[in-house]
Protein backbone atom coordinates (compact mmCIF):
# COMPACT_ATOMS: atom_id res chain seq x y z
CA UNK A 1 0.00 0.00 0.00
CA UNK A 2 1.34 3.42 -0.96
CA UNK A 3 2.55 5.54 1.94
CA UNK A 4 0.98 8.89 2.88
CA UNK A 5 2.92 11.46 4.93
CA UNK A 6 1.11 13.43 7.65
CA UNK A 7 2.64 16.68 8.89
CA UNK A 8 2.10 20.08 10.52
CA UNK A 9 3.64 23.44 9.64
CA UNK A 10 7.25 24.63 9.54
CA UNK A 11 8.71 25.76 12.90
CA UNK A 12 6.33 23.20 14.46
CA UNK A 13 4.70 23.79 17.82
CA UNK A 14 3.30 21.07 20.06
CA UNK A 15 -0.01 20.86 18.17
CA UNK A 16 1.75 20.49 14.80
CA UNK A 17 3.87 17.57 16.05
CA UNK A 18 1.35 15.82 18.29
CA UNK A 19 -1.59 16.11 15.90
CA UNK A 20 0.53 14.66 13.09
CA UNK A 21 1.32 11.66 15.30
CA UNK A 22 -2.28 11.29 16.50
CA UNK A 23 -3.86 11.57 13.06
CA UNK A 24 -1.35 9.23 11.43
CA UNK A 25 -2.25 6.66 14.09
CA UNK A 26 -5.99 7.08 13.41
CA UNK A 27 -5.45 6.72 9.65
CA UNK A 28 -3.39 3.55 10.24
CA UNK A 29 -6.21 2.12 12.35
CA UNK A 30 -8.52 2.84 9.41
CA UNK A 31 -6.26 0.99 6.97
CA UNK A 32 -4.02 3.70 5.52
CA UNK A 33 -0.22 3.41 5.38
CA UNK A 34 0.34 6.77 7.10
CA UNK A 35 3.55 8.12 8.64
CA UNK A 36 3.90 11.31 10.70
CA UNK A 37 6.84 13.56 9.82
CA UNK A 38 7.94 17.06 10.86
CA UNK A 39 9.11 20.14 8.96
CA UNK A 40 11.33 21.60 11.68
CA UNK A 41 13.02 21.17 15.03
CA UNK A 42 11.14 19.85 18.06
CA UNK A 43 10.79 22.49 20.80
CA UNK A 44 11.64 21.92 24.45
CA UNK A 45 7.95 21.93 25.33
CA UNK A 46 7.08 19.30 22.72
CA UNK A 47 10.07 17.14 23.68
CA UNK A 48 8.85 17.19 27.28
CA UNK A 49 5.49 15.77 26.14
CA UNK A 50 7.10 13.12 23.93
CA UNK A 51 9.42 12.02 26.74
CA UNK A 52 6.66 12.04 29.36
CA UNK A 53 4.42 9.76 27.32
CA UNK A 54 7.34 7.77 25.87
CA UNK A 55 6.57 8.44 22.22
CA UNK A 56 9.26 8.83 19.59
CA UNK A 57 9.25 12.11 17.68
CA UNK A 58 8.57 12.04 13.92
CA UNK A 59 11.52 12.18 11.54
CA UNK A 60 12.49 15.45 9.88
CA UNK A 61 11.85 16.11 6.18
CA UNK A 62 12.25 19.22 4.04
CA UNK A 63 10.68 17.78 0.89
CA UNK A 64 7.99 15.15 0.42
CA UNK A 65 7.60 14.55 -3.33
CA UNK A 66 10.78 12.46 -3.36
CA UNK A 67 9.00 9.98 -1.06
CA UNK A 68 5.26 10.06 -1.73
CA UNK A 69 2.56 11.27 -4.11
CA UNK A 70 -0.05 11.99 -1.42
CA UNK A 71 0.05 13.93 1.86
CA UNK A 72 -2.23 15.03 4.69
CA UNK A 73 -1.82 18.44 6.36
CA UNK A 74 -2.61 19.11 10.01
CA UNK A 75 -2.59 22.43 11.89
CA UNK A 76 -1.98 24.50 8.74
CA UNK A 77 -3.05 25.02 5.14
CA UNK A 78 -1.09 27.99 3.79
CA UNK A 79 1.50 26.99 1.19
CA UNK A 80 4.34 29.05 2.62
CA UNK A 81 3.98 27.23 5.95
CA UNK A 82 4.09 23.77 4.38
CA UNK A 83 6.69 21.48 2.80
CA UNK A 84 8.98 23.21 0.31
CA UNK A 85 7.65 21.10 -2.58
CA UNK A 86 4.00 20.95 -1.51
CA UNK A 87 2.96 21.95 -5.05
CA UNK A 88 4.40 18.66 -6.34
CA UNK A 89 2.15 16.35 -4.31
CA UNK A 90 -1.58 15.80 -3.91
CA UNK A 91 -3.13 16.98 -0.65
CA UNK A 92 -5.64 14.31 0.36
CA UNK A 93 -6.85 15.95 3.56
CA UNK A 94 -6.48 19.03 5.74
CA UNK A 95 -7.39 19.07 9.44
CA UNK A 96 -6.94 22.60 10.78
CA UNK A 97 -8.19 25.43 13.00
CA UNK A 98 -6.68 28.47 11.28
CA UNK A 99 -7.81 30.91 8.60
CA UNK A 100 -7.78 29.53 5.05
CA UNK A 101 -5.35 31.45 2.84
CA UNK A 102 -3.07 30.81 -0.13
CA UNK A 103 -4.50 27.32 -0.60
CA UNK A 104 -5.99 25.55 -3.61
CA UNK A 105 -5.91 22.03 -4.99
CA UNK A 106 -6.39 20.43 -8.39
CA UNK A 107 -8.48 17.61 -6.92
CA UNK A 108 -11.34 17.38 -4.42
CA UNK A 109 -10.19 16.65 -0.87
CA UNK A 110 -11.42 16.13 2.67
CA UNK A 111 -11.08 19.52 4.38
CA UNK A 112 -12.02 19.96 8.01
CA UNK A 113 -11.46 23.31 9.65
CA UNK A 114 -13.21 24.29 12.87
CA UNK A 115 -13.08 27.49 14.96
CA UNK A 116 -11.55 25.81 18.01
CA UNK A 117 -8.29 26.43 19.83
CA UNK A 118 -6.41 23.33 18.72
CA UNK A 119 -6.26 20.71 15.96
CA UNK A 120 -6.18 17.92 18.56
CA UNK A 121 -9.66 18.97 19.70
CA UNK A 122 -10.95 18.15 16.21
CA UNK A 123 -9.02 14.86 16.15
CA UNK A 124 -10.64 13.84 19.44
CA UNK A 125 -14.02 14.09 17.68
CA UNK A 126 -12.73 12.17 14.66
CA UNK A 127 -11.53 9.25 16.77
CA UNK A 128 -15.02 9.03 18.29
CA UNK A 129 -16.76 9.39 14.92
CA UNK A 130 -14.73 6.47 13.58
CA UNK A 131 -15.22 4.31 16.67
CA UNK A 132 -11.49 4.08 17.38
CA UNK A 133 -10.26 4.08 20.98
CA UNK A 134 -7.42 6.51 21.72
CA UNK A 135 -4.33 4.89 23.23
CA UNK A 136 -3.11 6.31 26.54
CA UNK A 137 0.11 7.69 25.01
CA UNK A 138 -1.69 9.33 22.09
CA UNK A 139 -4.29 10.83 24.43
CA UNK A 140 -1.40 12.35 26.39
CA UNK A 141 0.05 13.95 23.29
CA UNK A 142 -3.33 15.30 22.20
CA UNK A 143 -3.86 16.74 25.68
CA UNK A 144 -0.40 18.34 25.46
CA UNK A 145 -1.35 19.99 22.17
CA UNK A 146 -4.50 21.52 23.66
CA UNK A 147 -2.66 22.75 26.76
CA UNK A 148 0.03 24.31 24.57
CA UNK A 149 -2.32 26.07 22.15
CA UNK A 150 -4.62 27.30 24.93
CA UNK A 151 -1.86 28.22 27.42
CA UNK A 152 -3.53 25.85 29.91
CA UNK A 153 -7.03 27.07 28.96
CA UNK A 154 -6.19 30.74 29.62
CA UNK A 155 -5.86 31.96 26.03
CA UNK A 156 -8.82 33.78 24.45
CA UNK A 157 -8.51 31.30 21.56
CA UNK A 158 -9.61 28.48 23.90
CA UNK A 159 -13.21 27.23 23.53
CA UNK A 160 -15.47 25.06 25.68
CA UNK A 161 -14.86 22.27 23.18
CA UNK A 162 -11.11 22.45 23.84
CA UNK A 163 -11.61 22.26 27.61
CA UNK A 164 -14.04 19.33 27.32
CA UNK A 165 -11.69 17.43 24.99
CA UNK A 166 -8.77 18.05 27.34
CA UNK A 167 -10.71 16.64 30.30
CA UNK A 168 -11.56 13.48 28.34
CA UNK A 169 -8.00 13.05 27.12
CA UNK A 170 -6.49 13.65 30.58
CA UNK A 171 -8.65 10.84 31.95
CA UNK A 172 -7.48 8.45 29.24
CA UNK A 173 -3.86 9.54 29.70
CA UNK A 174 -4.08 9.15 33.47
CA UNK A 175 -2.81 12.62 34.31
CA UNK A 176 -4.12 15.74 36.00
CA UNK A 177 -4.43 18.32 33.22
CA UNK A 178 -3.52 21.31 35.41
CA UNK A 179 -0.44 19.91 37.16
CA UNK A 180 0.91 18.13 34.07
CA UNK A 181 0.14 21.17 31.93
CA UNK A 182 2.00 23.55 34.19
CA UNK A 183 5.01 21.21 34.19
CA UNK A 184 4.96 21.07 30.39
CA UNK A 185 4.59 24.83 29.97
CA UNK A 186 7.45 25.40 32.40
CA UNK A 187 9.64 23.12 30.29
CA UNK A 188 8.74 25.21 27.25
CA UNK A 189 9.45 28.41 29.16
CA UNK A 190 13.02 27.37 30.01
CA UNK A 191 14.99 29.94 28.06
CA UNK A 192 18.38 29.18 29.61
CA UNK A 193 21.15 28.84 27.08
CA UNK A 194 19.41 31.08 24.53
CA UNK A 195 21.28 34.09 23.14
CA UNK A 196 19.58 37.50 23.01
CA UNK A 197 19.35 37.16 19.22
CA UNK A 198 17.60 33.80 19.64
CA UNK A 199 15.21 35.17 22.25
CA UNK A 200 13.91 37.95 20.01
CA UNK A 201 13.56 35.63 17.00
CA UNK A 202 12.17 32.42 18.59
CA UNK A 203 8.63 33.45 17.72
CA UNK A 204 8.72 36.72 15.76
CA UNK A 205 6.37 37.91 13.03
CA UNK A 206 6.38 41.06 10.93
CA UNK A 207 3.24 43.05 10.17
CA UNK A 208 2.20 46.08 8.15
CA UNK A 209 -0.11 48.19 10.32
CA UNK A 210 -1.42 51.25 8.52
CA UNK A 211 1.74 52.96 7.32
CA UNK A 212 3.87 51.38 10.03
CA UNK A 213 6.20 48.42 9.75
CA UNK A 214 5.95 46.45 12.99
CA UNK A 215 7.58 43.31 14.34
CA UNK A 216 6.16 41.46 17.34
CA UNK A 217 8.11 38.73 19.12
CA UNK A 218 6.79 36.68 22.04
CA UNK A 219 8.32 34.32 24.58
CA UNK A 220 6.78 32.51 27.55
CA UNK A 221 8.46 32.60 30.95
CA UNK A 222 7.80 31.41 34.49
CA UNK A 223 9.07 34.78 35.71
CA UNK A 224 9.33 37.75 33.35
CA UNK A 225 12.27 39.07 35.37
CA UNK A 226 14.33 36.07 34.24
CA UNK A 227 14.17 37.58 30.75
CA UNK A 228 14.05 41.29 31.54
CA UNK A 229 17.18 41.13 33.68
CA UNK A 230 18.88 41.19 30.27
CA UNK A 231 16.94 44.28 29.11
CA UNK A 232 20.01 46.33 28.18
CA UNK A 233 21.33 43.52 25.95
CA UNK A 234 17.87 42.91 24.51
CA UNK A 235 17.47 46.58 23.61
CA UNK A 236 20.82 46.52 21.87
CA UNK A 237 19.93 43.59 19.58
CA UNK A 238 16.36 44.85 19.05
CA UNK A 239 17.65 48.28 18.04
CA UNK A 240 19.93 46.62 15.50
CA UNK A 241 16.94 44.77 14.01
CA UNK A 242 14.87 47.99 13.93
CA UNK A 243 17.63 49.73 12.01
CA UNK A 244 18.35 46.82 9.69
CA UNK A 245 14.70 46.29 8.71
CA UNK A 246 13.56 49.89 8.88
CA UNK A 247 10.94 49.09 11.50
CA UNK A 248 8.74 51.70 13.15
CA UNK A 249 8.19 49.46 16.17
CA UNK A 250 9.60 46.25 17.60
CA UNK A 251 7.44 44.93 20.45
CA UNK A 252 9.03 42.15 22.48
CA UNK A 253 6.37 40.48 24.62
CA UNK A 254 7.33 38.35 27.61
CA UNK A 255 4.33 36.35 28.84
CA UNK A 256 4.18 35.04 32.41
CA UNK A 257 2.58 31.59 32.21
CA UNK A 258 1.65 31.70 35.90
CA UNK A 259 -0.10 35.09 36.07
CA UNK A 260 -1.22 35.27 32.41
CA UNK A 261 0.03 38.83 32.17
CA UNK A 262 2.75 40.09 29.85
CA UNK A 263 5.43 42.74 29.86
CA UNK A 264 6.00 44.58 26.60
CA UNK A 265 9.39 46.02 25.68
CA UNK A 266 8.81 48.60 22.94
CA UNK A 267 11.63 49.95 20.79
CA UNK A 268 11.30 52.29 17.80
CA UNK A 269 10.02 55.72 16.84
CA UNK A 270 6.41 54.52 17.10
CA UNK A 271 6.74 53.01 20.60
CA UNK A 272 4.07 55.44 21.83
CA UNK A 273 1.51 53.42 19.85
CA UNK A 274 1.77 50.77 22.57
CA UNK A 275 0.84 53.40 25.17
CA UNK A 276 -2.21 54.46 23.15
CA UNK A 277 -3.28 50.90 22.34
CA UNK A 278 -3.24 49.69 25.94
CA UNK A 279 -3.67 52.95 27.86
CA UNK A 280 -0.36 52.44 29.65
CA UNK A 281 2.77 54.50 30.17
CA UNK A 282 6.10 53.09 29.05
CA UNK A 283 8.66 53.31 31.83
CA UNK A 284 12.21 52.51 30.75
CA UNK A 285 10.65 51.30 27.45
CA UNK A 286 8.49 48.67 29.21
CA UNK A 287 4.87 48.36 30.35
CA UNK A 288 2.80 45.62 31.96
CA UNK A 289 0.02 44.35 29.68
CA UNK A 290 -2.54 42.88 32.08
CA UNK A 291 -4.27 39.74 30.84
CA UNK A 292 -2.54 39.80 27.46
CA UNK A 293 -1.37 36.35 26.33
CA UNK A 294 -2.39 36.01 22.67
CA UNK A 295 -0.55 37.86 19.92
CA UNK A 296 -3.19 36.80 17.38
CA UNK A 297 -6.20 38.04 19.35
CA UNK A 298 -4.94 40.61 21.85
CA UNK A 299 -1.95 42.34 20.27
CA UNK A 300 -2.10 42.42 16.47
CA UNK A 301 -5.72 43.67 16.15
CA UNK A 302 -5.32 46.26 18.93
CA UNK A 303 -2.08 47.70 17.56
CA UNK A 304 -3.37 47.62 13.98
CA UNK A 305 -6.42 49.66 14.97
CA UNK A 306 -4.20 52.14 16.82
CA UNK A 307 -1.83 52.63 13.88
CA UNK A 308 -4.71 53.03 11.43
CA UNK A 309 -6.13 55.81 13.62
CA UNK A 310 -2.83 57.71 13.80
UniProtKB/Swiss-Prot annotation:
Gene Ontology, cellular component aspect: cytoplasm
Cofactor note as given: Binds 2 manganese ions per subunit.
Subcellular compartments: Cytoplasm
Catalysis performed (reactions): diphosphate + H2O = 2 phosphate + H(+)
Residues engaged in binding Mn(2+) 1: 9, 13, 75
Keyword RNA-binding: no
Cofactor(s) it depends on: Mn(2+)
UniProt similarity note: Belongs to the PPase class C family.
Residues that bind Mn(2+) 2: 15, 75, 97, 149
Record Pfam families: DHH, DHHA2
GO molecular function: inorganic diphosphate phosphatase activity; manganese ion binding
Organism classification: Bacteria, Bacillati, Bacillota, Bacilli, Bacillales
Superkingdom of the source species: Bacteria
Name this polypeptide is given: Probable manganese-dependent inorganic pyrophosphatase
Broad class of enzyme this protein falls into: hydrolase
Gene field: ppaC
PANTHER family the UniProt entry points to: BNIP - RELATED (PTHR12112), MANGANESE-DEPENDENT INORGANIC PYROPHOSPHATASE-RELATED (PTHR12112:SF22)
UniProtKB keywords: Cytoplasm, Hydrolase, Manganese, Metal-binding
Amino acid sequence: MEKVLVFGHKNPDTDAICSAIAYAELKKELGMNAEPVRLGEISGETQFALDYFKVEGPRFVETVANEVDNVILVDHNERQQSANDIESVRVLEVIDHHRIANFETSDPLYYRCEPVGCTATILNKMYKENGVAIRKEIAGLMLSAIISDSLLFKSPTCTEQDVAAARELAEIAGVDAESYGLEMLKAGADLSGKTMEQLISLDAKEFQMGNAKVEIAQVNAVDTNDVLVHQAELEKVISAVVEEKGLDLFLFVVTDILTNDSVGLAIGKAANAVEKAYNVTLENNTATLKGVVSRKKQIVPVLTETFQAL
